[in-house]
Amino acid sequence: IRPVPASELEARLEKFRRLMDEMHPGWEMAAVNHKIAMYYFTGTMQEGVLLIRPQDAIFWVRRNYERAVNESHFSDIRPMHSFREAAAFYGSAPRIMYVETKKATLDWERMLHKYFAFEEVGSFDAVLQELRLRKSAYELQQMERSGAIHETVLDVIAPKLIHAGISEAQLAIELYSEMVQRGSHG
């Protein structure tokens, strides 16, 4: 698996900040914890939270810090044992904490509030949707690469794997294995 280039991650953060400024003027902080959005911004999926402010972005990792550092070209990755550490770093809490409300659970929002004591939750769902709507050159290249993997596995390899007596489960396992060996995330 090839790491997402640092320049791509930085461009995504810059676009996020610009859209937040347009849609939520005066915003102070956004918290990303959903794995897909986390991968989009950091290039890795670990347990923790990405906290984005207009002036900085820090990826706080609870587990697998070393893995995060090895997989990601994100500029600021820090270990944390508890959200208390991240909250202490920032000092005062923002009035509105922006989260991905379509994905954030009420339990997670309550836990975040316990440590950051913000007054209300705001949604950056529309920002994320707008951001991911237009693909970068890197994203288009990755889509083409993914398509090539699928084409090879489904058009070239799958016909060779199919034989009398193979179960659907066994075929799925073998196809999945072929995809992952070629760089698919599965």
Mark where each language-model region is.
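Short amphipathic alpha-helical segments
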Residues: G43-M45, S72, E109-L112
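Residues at the C-termini of beta-strands that transition into short coil/loop
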Residues: P54, R63, M80-F83, T101, ...
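Flexible, acidic/His-enriched mid-domain "rim/lid" segments that flank
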Residues: E8, E85-H185
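Short secondary-structure junctions
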Residues: M23-G26, R182-G186
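Compact, glycine/acidic-enriched structural inserts
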Residues: W60-A88
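Short, structured coil segments at secondary-structure junctions
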Residues: R53, S72-S75, Y115-A117
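Short, polar loop motifs at secondary-structure junctions
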Residues: K35-I36, V61-R67, K103-W108
